[in-house]
Amino acid sequence: MAQKIQKTNVCRLLDAAGVEYELIEYAVDEADLSATHVAQQLGEDVDAVFKTIVLEGDKIKHFVCVVPGACEVDLKKAARVSGNKSCKPIPQKELLPLTGYIRGGCCPIGMKKPFPTYIDETCLMHEKIYVSAGQRGMQLRLTPQSLIDYVPLTVSDLI
């Protein structure tokens, strides 16, 4: 009998809201937590695997950007859409206390506090996208619109 995948808190939130998703496990390589590695493990295009980046701005203290795995957030674009003049990624040591997530497991769903959250417009080119399920080794596969509606996300040009 196959072992049942243990659901994450993110999954429980989506279940409670009636959001359809697929939970997928993959082998974690602690030396390579990149979205490219995750995409290889999933056998998917890295452009469909989105990563969650937490930023701090000069006006809006903290906000979140969700971008395709092979891309970097354009900080000028991120600052503009978030109402900041400038922004930068938060230091890694601040990620867990601020969001409740660790690097490689950060998800735009279920953070400790709600932050303004933006997703790159390229998400709409995919029928389904992947985002972390809230812990390393687990990804959610869902429609971009489901994610946009649930969080909620603002669709923007971020790359």
Give a label for each model feature:
Residues M1-I159:
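Extended, low-hydrophobicity, polar/charged segments
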